[in-house]
Amino acid sequence: MRRPAVAGSFYPAQKAELGAQIAESLSRAGLALKLGNARDIAAAVCPHAGYMYSGWVAAFSYSRIAAAFSKPPVFVIVGPNHTGQGSPVALSQQDWDTPLGIAKNDAEFGKEIVKCGTIIDLDERAHEFEHSIEVQLPFLQKIYGERLRIVPICLGMQNMDSAKDIAEAVQKASARLKREAFIIASSDFTHFESAESAKMHDAHALDALKRLDEGKFFEQVRLRNLTICGYGPILSAMHYARLEGCRKAEILKYANSGDVTGDHNSVVAYCSAVFPLG
């Protein structure tokens, strides 16, 4: 069992308080978690900062996910490795505990991903203290409760090859097991610049993201030294979306921590996006 690492810091440690925080995030965004069956998206990008800063931005993606799937697919959550621990591409087979209960791991699907990939390891060390995947779970639990099934992948080796390997392995596993899969890329955008500077720098990456141009997105991150911490997970989502027939991304919300704190001199930027099918 993977125990919470950031409950009480990134989000409330008590069930009632966490539920209230999620409700507040949705209220600020003017959204609801209303189940539908549109099945019109293949992947999403969500931020992973403290809920008080980025929860309301994440709400945009999770509202669309709820509207797309009344029956949950397997959620493959790919997050960057901030701690440096464990395998460079680490897939967890554990169930994950949160204040809202146990998020069950789809161990069969995870093992199939490892079989279908070439560089993906079964490894728990990378996940032990990592927050980028953990903070996604309460929103998903709020939508799907005990029906939720997850496959967490912590990505330390962020490049085109690893991103493609994950995406292609997920698609192959989905086909072999005849199970619907959905990739959530966990990432914040530019860190610790003014809001104006962050928006200017992120615009280059967001343009490539919208056009589903993986090569251009990676080029902009490297060429401009963009501090998008989860660019590898985003590349995985982009490649998977393209494999599933998507031709663009839809930016649902772009904001920064200054929109909450009032300090626009040094911010962290956040983005919610989805990849529409067709």
Describe the predicted segments one by one.
Residues V268-S272:
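Short hydrophobic/aromatic beta-strand or adjacent loop that forms the aromatic wall/cage
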